[in-house]
């Protein structure tokens, strides 16, 4: 890396790294460092009247107070933080005091990883700490951390800009309390979900991510190209059709937890790639699946929060069963006053106009109903509510309702105004399924880019016979948002998709050299803030001369300074 791209603090740290090596101390040792305790466990297990406990810990220096021959640091490990008391004569028992006077006091910085061996004690101020007897350098940090400081309960120098936090999640995890806890809870959610499904006897499977046909959901896919086969492939939008093939093949129940991809918008509830759990169980229907879902979510909530309740956006949400069950057309009537039962596509289109909705000719009956529900109903269901019995036009993979003509045995679980789960009594009639796919094809021809393709191989599988089956998909990201009280999906994804980072435009060196500027001075001029040749047009040559000569001196570049007359000549040529 060019030294001009470094900050003053980064240069100092690199010099410290080199000085450590000159002393014979490797700043990035290869050997294993053996630890026997974590910070939180040390504090939890400490007893004042017990024999001093000898521990070996490792972590990152997060703060320090140097006081001559004795100092305090705060060490952060994977579980928390603990204070360490370091004295010169304890870590340097012999004549050589360099480990304290030079290494600890001058060459170590905040963010560095060290190992500490010592014994646990309580300070006069009452804080459980480690009295260091040996210090080992484990990894040098050559980029300063944005250390958050607190005074009278107020945070200073906070690393709280959302874009920076999401782009540099590694820094966010280090310096911001609570961030890591959110992701540990996410891990608990997935672990508990797996436990429930495994205990029920269902088999976890893996199915392809690259699909020849995008199927299993109504969504716009990402398209890629396989060079060897010279064919387009699609990143999967759902695992549904492959999992159903496995039910055809004889599995009692199968589930998959994995990534799906949808080439759609990004907002606080949507990310182009997201994690979903899909489950399919033979000989079950959507009524059974509602009950199973209640038990699953209740257990997850208890595992994560210790109770069946969670709080988000200031609202307390209870996952204790049972949940309300409400047909979608009844929900629309309840929220808008319009009864859509038996209405034609044109009649529903007229309702949309009366509701002053933006619609277009590509929208079929199902899409129109979906738009009405999304705009006027969805956001009103805060407590868990099963919205059931969707029109067939909205549900091309769902079995027709056993007693309600024109409707299907489908439910979506709404929580905090958003869909959390989608489930069916699965359509297993191959003739009916083919007709539904053809209807989707007509929608595609009308311009609906979310309509499903016809999957001939899936139809072939159904023709061999699929038993009555119920299936469900649950969004892990949204579930984590609910269980951890996060309002933005980016807070529960380690590395959410981001728009391209803004980069300062710079002219190529050749453009500067056309003015007679030596190549070695181009980077210096750009460091001074003149990234484009045009930036120099109206500058005072004497100021430019002072700026670049100052940088040459500050960074010890040892370049031969140009004269003011040289600089005047550069500027005149612009």
Residue ranges and their predicted role:
Residues 1-504:
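Class II aminoacyl-tRNA synthetase catalytic cores and aaRS-like
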Residues 501-574:
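Compact, charge-rich alpha-helical regulatory domains located at protein termini
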């Amino acid at each position: 890396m060019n030294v001009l791209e470094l900050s003053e603090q980064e240069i100092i740290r690199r010099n410290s790294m080199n000085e450590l090596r000159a002393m014979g101390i490797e700043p990035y040792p290869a050997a294993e460092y053996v630890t026997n305790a974590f910070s939180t466990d040390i504090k939890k297990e400490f007893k004042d009247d017990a024999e001093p406990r000898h521990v070996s810990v490792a972590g990152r220096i997060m703060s320090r107070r140097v006081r001559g021959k004795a100092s305090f640091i705060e060490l952060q490990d994977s579980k928390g933080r603990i204070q360490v008391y370091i004295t010169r004569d304890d870590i340097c028992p012999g004549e050589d005091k360099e480990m304290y006077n030079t290494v600890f006091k001058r060459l170590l910085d905040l963010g560095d990883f060290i190992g500490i061996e010592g014994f646990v004690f309580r300070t006069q101020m009452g804080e459980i700490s480690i009295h260091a007897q040996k210090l080992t350098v484990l990894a040098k940090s050559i980029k300063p951390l944005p250390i958050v400081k607190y005074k009278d309960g107020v945070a200073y120098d906070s690393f709280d800009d959302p874009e920076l936090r999401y782009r540099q999640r590694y820094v966010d995890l280090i310096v911001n309390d609570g961030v890591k806890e959110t992701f540990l809870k996410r891990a608990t959610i997935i672990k508990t979900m797996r436990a429930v499904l495994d205990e029920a006897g269902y088999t976890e499977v893996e199915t392809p991510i690259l699909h020849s046909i995008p199927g299993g959901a109504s969504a716009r896919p990402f398209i890629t190209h396989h060079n060897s086969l010279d064919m387009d492939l699609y990143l999967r939008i759902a695992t549904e059709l492959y999992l159903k093939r496995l039910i055809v093949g004889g599995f009692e129940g199968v589930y998959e937890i994995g990534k799906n991809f949808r080439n759609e918008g990004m907002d606080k509830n949507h990310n182009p790639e997201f994690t979903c759990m899909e489950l399919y169980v033979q000989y079950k229907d959507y009524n059974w699946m509602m009950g199973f879902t209640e038990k699953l979510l209740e257990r997850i909530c208890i595992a994560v929060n210790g109770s069946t309740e969670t709080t988000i956006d200031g609202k307390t949400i209870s996952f204790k069963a049972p949940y309300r069950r409400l047909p979608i057309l009844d929900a629309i009537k309840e929220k808008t006053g319009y009864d859509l039962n038996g209405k034609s596509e044109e009649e529903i289109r007229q309702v949309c106009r009366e509701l002053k909705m933006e619609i277009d000719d590509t929208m079929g009956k199902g899409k129109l109903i979906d738009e009405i529900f999304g705009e006027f109903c969805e956001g009103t269901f805060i407590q868990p509510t099963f919205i059931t019995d969707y029109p067939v036009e909205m549900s091309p993979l769902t079995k027709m309702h056993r007693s309600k003509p024109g409707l299907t045995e489908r439910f979506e679980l709404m929580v905090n105004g958003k869909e959390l789960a989608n489930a069916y009594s699965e359509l297993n009639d191959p003739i009916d399924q083919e007709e539904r796919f053809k209807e989707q094809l007509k929608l595609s021809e009308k311009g609906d880019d979310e309509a499903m393709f016809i999957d001939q191989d899936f139809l072939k599988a159904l023709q061999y016979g699929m038993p009555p089956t119920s299936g469900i998909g649950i969004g892990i990201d949204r579930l984590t948002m609910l269980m951890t009280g996060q309002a933005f999906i980016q807070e529960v994804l380690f590395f959410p998709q981001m728009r391209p980072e803004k980069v300062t435009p710079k002219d190529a060196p050749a453009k500067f050299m056309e003015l007679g500027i030596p190549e070695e001075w181009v980077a210096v001029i750009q460091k001074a803030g003149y990234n484009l040749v045009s930036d120099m047009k109206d500058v005072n040559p004497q100021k430019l001369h002072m700026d670049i000569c100052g940088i040459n001196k500050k960074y010890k570049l040892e370049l031969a300074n140009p004269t003011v007359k040289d600089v005047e000549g550069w500027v005149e040529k612009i």
